[in-house]
Amino acid sequence: PMGVVRPIRGSLKPTTEIFVCEMGARHVGDIKEICDMVHPEHGVITSIGPQHLETFFNMENIQKTKFELADALPEGGMLFFNGDNDYIQQQAASPEYDQTPEKIFYNSETEGTGYCAKDVKVSQLGTEFTVVTPDGESERFQMRLIGAHNVSNVVWAIAVAHKMGLTLQ
């Protein structure tokens, strides 16, 4: 939690409109604790995997902990899910999350399920791809990061910005 508290206390100004932070966890309840401090309006669940099994003991505890973010969002909030991650898809489909704020999926290449990246091309100069929105709008993007594995992180950032009112351009 201190990794989130420091920038809030030291860097945020009264004019700050959007604050993005990573909520890391090593134990069940860690994300809930951070959510209780920052009261997020929207959230992104980027990955669920076998990290920190020594403290979580099983995958169900990791899933439960990551979805503490979903439990903390207010009515009208948006929750972005990585549609490429099987653990996230499984948990998001659970009946207990039917009443979750708006669910928005993003993924690397599966069109029609949310925001996705198509025509990914990697070169020595970087990576290019086209983002397609759920309503079919599309835009080509270039980044200096090399590797298709970086595309998913950029797609979620684009999805969040777009859903908050920015254009794809």
Task: Cite the ranges covered by each PLM segment.
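ATP-dependent carboxylate-amine ligase catalytic core
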Residues: P1-E68, V151
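Acidic, Mg2+-coordinating active-site environments of NTP-dependent enzymes
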Residues: I45-Q169
